[in-house]
Amino acid sequence: LLVLAGAGSGKTRVLVHRIAYLIEEKQVNPWNILAITFTNKAAGEMRDRVNQQVHFGADSVWVSTFHSTCVRILRRHIEFLGYETNFTIYDTDDQKTVMKQVYKIMDVDSKLYKERDVMAHISNAKDELITPEEYLKNAQGDIHEQTVAKIYQEYQRCLKKNNALDFDDLIMKTVQLFRTQPMVLDFYQERFRYIMIDEYQDTNKAQFELVHLLAGKYKNLCVVGDDDQSIYRFRGADIGNILNFEDSFSGAKVVKLEQNYRSTQNILDAANLVIRNNRGRKDKTLWTSNGKGPLIHFQRLDQAYEEAEFIIRDILSKGYPYQECVVLYRTNAQSRLLEEQCIQFNIPYRLVGGVNFYQRKEIKDILAYMKTISNGRDDLAVGRIINVPKRGIGATSIAKLTTFAAANNNSLYDAMHKAGEISGLGKAADKISRFIELIEDFRGRMKQKEYSLRQLIEDIVEESGYRAELENEGEEEAESRMENIGELINKATSYWNDTKNPTLEEFLEEVSLVADIDQLDQRENRVTLMTLHSAKGLEFENVYLSGMEEGLFPSYMAVMSGDL
C-alpha cells in the first residue's frame, strides 16, 4: 500500500491508526509490527501516539529510524560479518580522522584527491550498495577512479581494524548480513510481518533493498510519502522508489491524502502553483477547509543585512511570541546576519545546524573515554584520550606505540598493554601502564549492576584528572565546559532511568545516532533559525523565507546540474 500524503495531510495519524487497527481489530501481535521513520524525534512522537491509541502491547511495536533499526540488528548478528558486537559508530569528524590516516598510509596527494570529495564518493557507493571490490572493478581504465577505489578499500580496512562502522555502513552491512545469512533474514521476516515506512520519498537504494528483503516473505508493506517533498537527492535519496512503487511491488494499491489540515488556501495555492510542473510527479492537488487566510507577504530589499534587519524588526513590531517564529534560508552561511540582528535587538534565538552539542571538545573527550571502556579496538577513541588530560605521554611515545601496533597487527590499546616490550619508551611506559589500569578499573566497575553511567562520567572527570586540567585553564572556561559535561550527565541519567536494561554500548549508540533536529525543543521562547532541509516536517505560526533570489534559492549549482 502506498499512501501519497501531501504536506499537513495527517500522515502520522494514518500510520498510528493503522498500527492501532492491526492490533485491536485484526489481533496482530504488536511484536510483529515495524514502523520506520526518518528522525529520532519523529520516532519518539509516533511511539507516544501509539501508546495513547493502543490499550495493550504498544511497547512491543518496534518504532525507530532506519539507522537505529539496523544497529539493533547488527548488535545481535554482526559477528557473521567479522566484527564484534560492541562496535563503535563513527561520526563525520571520526571519518575525517580515519581518512587522514588512510591518505598518510597510502601517500595520497590531497590536492589531486580532495578528502571531502572522496568521502562523498564512498558515501554514494555505500548508498548504492557498491563494495570496494565492485568499485575497483567498475573503475577499470580510469586511474582516478581506481585510486578512489583503493582509498575506499583501505578506509574500510581501517574501520574494521577499529571495530567501527560509519553511518552508511549501518544499512549496507545489514543488507549484506541478510543477503549472506538466510537464517537471520528469515528470523526478521517472521518477526516483522507488518512493515510501515514514513517519508518513503527520502529512501535511497540501500534502504529500498533493506525494505524489499524484510517484506519479501509476507509482503505486508505500507509506505507513506509524497514525491513533492523529495528534497534529499543530495544525500542519495532516490525519488524513483516512490514513483515506481507499483512496479517494484506488484499488486500495490495507492491512496491519496489531499486535504491539508495545517495551512490556509492561499498558502496551498502558491505551493500547488510552484510544484505542479515537476517532471514525473504523481498528480495531486492539496486543498483545505481552513479558509483563504491572509495573503503571502512579499518584501523586496536591496541588501542581505537590510533583509535580516527587516525580519527581526517585523517579529518585534508584530509582537509574535518568539517560539512561534522561524526564519528559513537555503544555506547555513546566511545565518550570520540574522544572528547579528537577533543579538543587536536582544532577541533570544536558537540556531539549528550550529555546533552540535556532541561535537564540543569536552563532550567528545568524555565520550572517547566511554568508547575506550566499551571497545578497546577503537584506535580513534584511544588516540584521542591517551594524553588527555596531559599525563606525560608525548607525541614521540604515541608514534612508537602506533608503529609497534601496526607491526604486530595489534590495536593501539593492545600495544599499550605491552608497553614494557617497546624499546625507547622510558618513563612513558609507566604512565601508559597507569592509563591502562584506569581504563581496566572502569571496565570492572561497569560490570557491577548498581554502577550507573552517571557515576562513570563523574568518576572519569575526577579520576582521570580532567576536571583539574580544566580548572587550570581558567575559572570561566572550566565553568562553561563543566556545564556541558553536566548536561551529558543529565542525558546519561535520563537514559539510565528510562531504559529497561541500560548498557554503555546502547547509550553510546543513542548519542551517535542523535541528529541536530532531535534536540529541538519548540517550547523554548526563542526565534528559530534553520535551513529549509532542517525544517521539513515542523510547524510554526509565522514563517519567514529569506534569500529568495536568483542563484541562491534555488542555488546556482542546482540550476546548472538540471536537478530542478
Q: Which ranges hold each PLM region?
A:
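Short alpha-helix plus adjacent loop in nuclease-associated cores
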Residues: 69-77, 228-235, 262-263, 351-374, ...
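Conserved phosphate/pyrophosphate-binding and hydrolysis machinery centered on Walker-type P-loop NTPases
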Residues: 36, 88-92, 108-116, 138-145, ...
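Conserved Walker B
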Residues: 7, 192-203, 207, 227-228, ...
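Helicase P-loop NTPase motor core
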Residues: 12-15, 78, 250-253, 258-348, ...
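Conserved helicase motor core of SF1/SF2 NTP-dependent helicases
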Residues: 9-12, 201-280, 284-289, 403-406, ...
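Conserved helicase C-terminal RecA-like lobe
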Residues: 138-141, 321, 335-347, 360, ...
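A basic/glycine-biased coupling hinge at the interface between accessory DNA-binding modules
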Residues: 1, 6-9, 19-194, 218-219, ...
